[in-house]
Swiss-Prot record:
Binds 1 zinc ion per subunit. Monomer. HAMAP family: Ile_tRNA_synth_type1 (MF_02002). It comes from Vibrio vulnificus (strain CMCP6). The lineage of its organism: Bacteria, Pseudomonadati, Pseudomonadota, Gammaproteobacteria, Vibrionales. Keywords: Aminoacyl-tRNA synthetase, ATP-binding, Cytoplasm, Ligase, Metal-binding, Nucleotide-binding, Protein biosynthesis, Zinc. This is Isoleucine--tRNA ligase. Catalyzes the attachment of isoleucine to tRNA(Ile). As IleRS can inadvertently accommodate and process structurally similar amino acids such as valine, to avoid such errors it has two additional distinct tRNA(Ile)-dependent editing activities. One activity is designated as 'pretransfer' editing and involves the hydrolysis of activated Val-AMP. The other activity is designated 'posttransfer' editing and involves deacylation of mischarged Val-tRNA(Ile). PROSITE patterns: AA_TRNA_LIGASE_I.
Length: 948
C-alpha cells in the first residue's frame, strides 16, 4: 500500500475535528474586532434596503442571565440572516439606565440622597454605577458572538438620549395626551413611589376576608324600596353587607356600590339576636353558609337601581355613605355589594368621580396612616388589618372573618405587597384625546408572531388605566414642566420651554434640570410657576426610544423599526409603552412586526432558581462548551413557548454540533488540491450523483432561507441536520469516498466530485453563519482562497449573501430526484443484509461482499441505469441485477417489494490501493497488487464515471 499512498487523494485540512470552542472563540473574537468585522458588514451593505430590529434595552444591573442570552442570540441570528439576504441591517444595542434598582444599589454604598451625599452627587454615583454595569454586560454579549455597535450603543442615560426623552414628553403634551390627576396608583411603600403596570407582579398572599355590616341610616326609607312579602318588615337592625380582603382601606370608605340590574334580597336572620341584612340574591346562600347562619328567610327583594343614594352608616366613623351603582360589581364572589374607597382603587376612583365622592387618602408614602387618621394613626396599613377587624367586632359590624389566600399585586423589586394610593401624579391619558382607540386600531396593522400576541395586547390596551408616568425618585429623567402655583396649569409656553431644557440637558445631562433657576427660563413668570420635581417612569424612557434612538441615530437612515423582539412578558411592558407613546407622538405604531419568545425553564419545566440549583449561566456554558453550542441550542428550540435548558439538553446540542462540524470538515478535507479558478467541472459534464448532490443543496437552501425569513430557526437547524446527516453523511459522502480518494488525481471523476463539494460548502457555510457564527468563520478561512472568477474571497462570510452558484437537476434528467431517492431505499435494504452477513461472519467489511439483486422488471430497469457503477453506490466489490424470476435459494427478502438479494463472500483478491476485490488483481504486469481500475487511475487517463 505504501508505494501507492502518494497516488491517493487523501483528505487533508487545517480545520480540526475538535472544535475546542471555549479556547478558539475568544481568539476569533479578537480578530473580528481588530479587523472591524461589524464595520466591514456596514460598508458592504451600505445603500441596500434596510431592516431595522430595534433592541429592547436590558436593565443595567447585574450579570446577564440565560434569558438575556436567548434574546440577544435570537436577535443576532435574525440580523445576520437578513444581512445574508441582502439587507442593510444595523444593530444598535441599548441599555435601560435609570430607575430604582440602580438607586438601591447605590444607596447601599453611599446612603440615601440628602443624608451623606447630595441629590446631585447621588445621581452622579448612579451614572457611574450604571456605566460599569453596561460595560460588564457588553463584554458578556460580545462573547456570545453578537455583532453590533458595541462602541456606540444607546444608553437611556446618555445626555442626548435624556434630552430626546424630554422632547418626547413635550410632544405628548403638545398632542393633548398629558394630564395631571389625583388618582389611585400602584404604590410600593418600600420604594416610596408609584409603580408602572409592568413593575407589578402577582403572587399569592393570605389576607383577612371579612363581611362587614353597614347599618341603614333611615330604616323606614330603605324598607320602602323593597317589595316585601305580605308586608312583613321583619325585626332587628337593617344592614347592607360588603365583603373585602383589605380591611385597612375601610377608613377611606366613602360608599357601598351595587349593580343596577342585580336583584338584592332583604333577609331576616332568625334566633335570639334577630337582624335583617341585604345582599345580592344569588349570593345569599353563600353568605349565610360563610357566616354560619342556618335559620333565616327572605322578606323581600329590590333592584340595585332602586337602592341608589340610600344612606348607610360607616361601620366605625360618625358619618354616612351612599349606595351607588357601578358596572364593576359582579356575583363571582363576595356579597354583590362592593366597599368603595376612591383613594385606594382604580374602579372605586372611577365610580366615585361619577358621584363626586371624596378621594380620601389617609395613608402616607411609607404605608403608615397619617397622624389625623382616627383610631389608626401611625400604624402600617398591613399591620393595621387586625386592628380594623377588632374595631369592627367592638362596633358589632363584623358579620364574618376568615383567612383567605388569593393573588395579590407585589413590587417586582422588593417582592412585597403593594397598595393602591391616591396621589397627585402625571398621566398619559388613554381616553381624553382618543389614544386608546387609536392604539387598538394600530395593533391590527402590526404582524404579531405568534398570532396570539395580538389578542393579548389588545386585551391589555382595552383594560389598562391611564399610564402613570411620574415617579418620586432621584435617578431618572425629570418631568421638565413648569406648573402654576395656584391653578396647577402648565405654563402656556411649555413647548418652547421643553426644547430649551432639552438643549441644556443635551450638554450637561439631567442634573441640569435641578440646577437650573426658573428665572433663567421664565423671567418674570418665575414667581408664579414652580418646577415639577418628579422623574419619569423608566418604561417611558425605553418606551420612547422609537423616537429618541431609532429616529435620531444615523445608522438607521431615518428608517422606522421593522421589528421588536422580546420575551412574551413585554406585551405588558415595552411593547405596550412603545405603542402608547408612539401613537401619542406620531399617530402610528412604532413597529411593523413584533416577535416574542418564551421564558427559559429547566429540563423539568421549572423556572430558573438559585434555591433549586437549576440556574444555567451563559458564562459557564461558553467557558465549558463554547458560544456556538449555546447559539445552536437557541436556534434549535421552538422559542414561541417555554424554552428548556439543562446540561443534558446542551449535551444534545453539542452532539448535533459535532455532526455538522464533521460534515463541514469532510468537505474541506476533500477540497485538498482544488482550485475553483481552474478546476471547476461544467455542470453538464459532472457525474450524475454530483449534480444530484448540488441539487439537494439548492433544495435545502430554498427551505433554509425561507425558514430564516419566517424567523423559524428551529426549522433551519432541523433542515441543516437532515442535510448533513441524511442526504450527505448517510448517502452522498459515503458513496463518493471511493471515487474521491482513489480516482486519478486531478482527473474528471475526482474534479467532478470536488466541484460538487465546493459548491455545497459555499452554501453550507452561509447557512451556518447566522447560528454557528464562530464555526462558519473558521470554515470560511479554510476554504479555497480564490473564487471561480479569479477574485479573492471576502475576508468574512458575514459580508456576503446566500450562495447563488447552486443548481438543480435539469428538466428531463433521467437520474432525477425520484431515482436517487429509490436508490437510497435500495441501498438501505441492502445494508441491512450486509450487516447481518457481517454479524454471522460471512463477510468482514462490505467490500468483501458480492451481491446479486433479483428485482421485478420495473425496479430492475431503474437499478440497471447505474450499469457497472451500482457497486459503488452499494459499497460492495461486485453487484449484478437479475430478473426476479431467476431468484436463487440464497436470496433473501428485503423491505422493498419486488427485491430479493443474495450476499456471498467474494473469492477475488483485494486491491492494495482501493481495497475492492476484483478478478483482475494480480493480472497486470508491474502492478500485481492493484486492480485494473487503479492502474488506470495511477498510470493511465483515469477511470470514467458517469453515474456515481
Amino acid at each position: 500500500m505504501s508505494e501507492y499512498k502518494d497516488t491517493l487523494n487523501l483528505p487533508e485540512t487545517g480545520f480540526p475535528m475538535r472544535g475546542d470552542l471555549a479556547k478558539r472563540e475568544p481568539e476569533m473574537l479578537k480578530r473580528w474586532y481588530q479587523e472591524d468585522l461589524y464595520g466591514e458588514i456596514r460598508k458592504a451593505k451600505k445603500g441596500k434596503k434596510s431592516f431595522v430590529l430595534h433592541d429592547g434595552p436590558p436593565y443595567a444591573n447585574g450579570d446577564i442571565h440565560i434569558g438575556h442570552a436567548l434574546n440577544k442570540i435570537l436577535k443576532d441570528i435574525i440580523i445576520k440572516s437578513k444581512t445574508l439576504s441582502g439587507f442593510d441591517a444595523p444593530y444598535v444595542p441599548g441599555w435601560d439606565c435609570h430607575g430604582l434598582p440602580i438607586e438601591l444599589m447605590v444607596e447601599k454604598k453611599v446612603g440615601k440622597p440628602g443624608q451623606k451625599v447630595t441629590a446631585a452627587e447621588f445621581r452622579e454615583k448612579c451614572r457611574e454605577y450604571a456605566a460599569g454595569q453596561v460595560e460588564g454586560q457588553k463584554e458578556s454579549f460580545k462573547r456570545l458572538g453578537i455583532m453590533g455597535e458595541w462602541d456606540k450603543p444607546y444608553r437611556t442615560m446618555d445626555f442626548t438620549t435624556e434630552a430626546n426623552i424630554i422632547r418626547a414628553l413635550g410632544q405628548i403634551a403638545d398632542n393633548g395626551h398629558l394630564l395631571k390627576g389625583f388618582k389611585p396608583v400602584h404604590w410600593c411603600t418600600d420604594c416610596g413611589s408609584a409603580l408602572a403596570e409592568a413593575e407589578v407582579e402577582y403572587k399569592n398572599k393570605v389576607s383577612p376576608s371579612i363581611d362587614v355590616r353597614f347599618k341603614a341610616a333611615d330604616e323606614a326609607a330603605l324598607l320602602a324600596k323593597f317589595s316585601l312579602n305580605e308586608g312583613h318588615q321583619g325585626q332587628g337592625d337593617v344592614s347592607i353587607v360588603i365583603w373585602t380582603t383589605t380591611p385597612w382601606t375601610l377608613p377611606a370608605n366613602r360608599a357601598v356600590c351595587l349593580r343596577d340590574d342585580l336583584e338584592y334580597v332583604l333577609i331576616q336572620v332568625e334566633g335570639d339576636n334577630p337582624e335583617r341584612i341585604i345582599v345580592a340574591a344569588e349570593l345569599a346562600k353563600d353568605v349565610m353558609d360563610r357566616a354560619g347562619i342556618e335559620h333565616f328567610h327572605n322578606l323581600g327583594f329590590a333592584k340595585g337601581a332602586d337602592l341608589e343614594l340610600t344612606q348607610f352608616q360607616h361601620p366605625f366613623y360618625d358619618f354616612t355613605v351612599p349606595a351607588i351603582l357601578g358596572d364593576h360589581v359582579t356575583t363571582d364572589s363576595g356579597t354583590g355589594v362592593v366597599h368603595t374607597a376612591p383613594g385606594h382603587g382604580q374602579e372605586d376612583f372611577a365610580v366615585g368621580q361619577k358621584y363626586n365622592l371624596e378621594v380620601a387618602n389617609p395613608v402616607g408614602s411609607n404605608g403608615v396612616y397619617l397622624p389625623d387618621t382616627e383610631l389608626f394613626a401611625g400604624q402600617h396599613v398591613f399591620k393595621a388589618n387586625d386592628a380594623v377587624v377588632e374595631t369592627l367586632k367592638e362596633k358589632g359590624a363584623l358579620l364574618h372573618h376568615h383567612a383567605y389566600e388569593h393573588s395579590y399585586p407585589h413590587c417586582w423589586r422588593h417582592k412585597t405587597p403593594i397598595i393602591f394610593r391616591a396621589t397627585p401624579q402625571w398621566f398619559v391619558s388613554m381616553d381624553q384625546a382618543g389614544l386608546r382607540a387609536k392604539a387598538l386600531e394600530s395593533i391590527k396593522g402590526v404582524q404579531w408572531m405568534p398570532e396570539w400576541g395580538q389578542s393579548r395586547i389588545e386585551g391589555m390596551i382595552e383594560g389598562r388605566p391611564e399610564w402613570c408616568i411620574s415617579r418620586q425618585r432621584t435617578w431618572g429623567v425629570p418631568i421638565a414642566l413648569f406648573v402654576h402655583k395656584e391653578t396647577a396649569e402648565l405654563h402656556p409656553n411649555t413647548s418652547e420651554l421643553i426644547e430649551k431644557v432639552a438643549q441644556v440637558v443635551e450638554q450637561k445631562g439631567i442634573q441640569a434640570w435641578w440646577d437650573i433657576d426658573a428665572a433663567e427660563l421664565l423671567g418674570d413668570d418665575a414667581a408664579q410657576y414652580e418646577k415639577v420635581l418628579d422623574t419619569l417612569d423608566v418604561w417611558f424612557d425605553s418606551g420612547v426610544t422609537h423616537y429618541a434612538v431609532v429616529d435620531k441615530r444615523e445608522e438607521f437612515n431615518g428608517a422606522e423599526a421593522d421589528m421588536y423582539l422580546e420575551g412574551s412578558d413585554q406585551h405588558r411592558g415595552w411593547f405596550q409603552s412603545s405603542l402608547i407613546s408612539s401613537i401619542a407622538m406620531k399617530g402610528k405604531a412604532p413597529y411593523k412586526q413584533v416577535l416574542t419568545h418564551g421564558f427559559v425553564v429547566d429540563g423539568h419545566g421549572r423556572k430558573m432558581s438559585k434555591s433549586i440549583g437549576n440556574v444555567v449561566a451563559p458564562k459557564d456554558v461558553t467557558n465549558k462548551l463554547g458560544a456556538d453550542i449555546l447559539r445552536l441550542w437557541v436556534a434549535s428550540t421552538d422559542y414561541t413557548g417555554e424554552v428548556a435548558v439543562s446540561d443534558e439538553i446542551l449535551k444534545r446540542s453539542a452532539d448535533a454540533y459535532r455532526r455538522i462540524r464533521n460534515t463541514a470538515r469532510f468537505f474541506l478535507a476533500n477540497l485538498n488540491g482544488f482550485n475553483p479558478e481552474t478546476d471547476i467541472v461544467p455542470v453538464e459534464e459532472m457525474v450524475a450523483l454530483d449534480r444530484w448532490a448540488v441539487g439537494r443543496a439548492l433544495a435545502a437552501q430554498n427551505e433554509i432561507v425561507k425558514a430564516y425569513d419566517e424567523y423559524n430557526t428551529h426549522a433551519v437547524t432541523q433542515r441543516l441536520m437532515h442535510f448533513c446527516s441524511i442526504e450527505m453523511g448517510s448517502f452522498y459522502l459515503d458513496v463518493i469516498k471511493d471515487r474521491q480518494y482513489t480516482a486519478k488525481l486531478g482527473g474528471h471523476a475526482q474534479r467532478s466530485c470536488q466541484t460538487a463539494l465546493y459548491y455545497i460548502v459555499e452554501a453550507l457555510v452561509r447557512w451556518m453563519a447566522p447560528i454557528m457564527s464562530f464555526t462558519a468563520d473558521e470554515i470560511w478561512n479554510q476554504m479555497p482562497a480564490s473564487l471561480p472568477s479569479g477574485e479573492s474571497r471576502d475576508k468574512f462570510v458575514f459580508t456576503g449573501e446566500w450562495f447563488d452558484g447552486l443548481f438543480g437537476l435539469a428538466e428531463g434528467e433521467e437520474l432525477n430526484n425520484a431515482f436517487w431517492s429509490e436508490m437510497q431505499k435500495v441501498r438501505g435494504a441492502v445494508n441491512k443484509l450486509l450487516e447481518a452477513a457481517r454479524s454471522d461472519k460471512t463477510i468482514g467489511g462490505s467490500l468483501q461482499a458480492e451481491l446479486t439483486l433479483f428485482a421485478d422488471d420495473a425496479l430492475a430497469a431503474k437499478i440497471n441505469k447505474l450499469e457497472d457503477e451500482l457497486r459503488f453506490v452499494l459499497l460492495t466489490s461486485a453487484a449484478t441485477v437479475k430478473p426476479l424470476s431467476e431468484k436463487s435459494d440464497a436470496a433473501q427478502a428485503t423491505d422493498i417489494e419486488g427485491l430479493f438479494v443474495a450476499v456471498r463472500a467474494t473469492e477475488a483478491e483485494k486491491c492494495d490501493r482501493c481495497w475492492h476485490h476484483t478478478p483482475d488483481v494480480g493480472t497486470i504486469e508491474g502492478h500485481e497488487k492493484i486492480c485494473g481500475r487503479c492502474v488506470s487511475n495511477v498510470d493511465g487517463e483515469g477511470e470514467a464515471r458517469k453515474f456515481a
